[in-house]
Amino acid sequence: GSTLLEQMSLHGVRHAPGSLEANDFFLANDQRHGALGSFVRADEHDLSTLGDHPLRSHGGLSEQQLPLLLSR
């Protein structure tokens, strides 16, 4: 089957399966001073494929500087 990101067809998003807190994560890159995303509303999006996985977001003033993790 296809992954949630493949189903969503998000351009510019890279999915990186990992074991960080037993959750997968994805990275979305945008231009400087840009913004990504919007509020997720159940009446506008099919969230049934998420199962028990939580939605998480970053973007508050206290979270503007995020650490960069690289793995090779």
Swiss-Prot record:
It is an enzyme of class 3 (hydrolase). Unaffected by EDTA or Ca(2+), Co(2+), Cu(2+), Mg(2+), Mn(2+), Ni(2+) and Zn(2+). Monomer. Optimum pH is 8.3. High activity between pH 7.5 and 8.6, rapidly loses activity below pH 7.0. Loss of activity below pH 6.3 is irreversible. Unlike bacterial phosphonoacetate hydrolase, does not require zinc as a cofactor. Its EC number is 3.11.1.2. Keywords: Hydrolase. Optimum temperature is 52 degrees Celsius. The keyword Transcription regulation does not apply. This is Phosphonoacetate hydrolase. It comes from the Eukaryota. GO terms for molecular function: phosphonoacetate hydrolase activity. It catalyses: phosphonoacetate + H2O = acetate + phosphate + H(+). InterPro entries: Alkaline_phosphatase_core_sf.
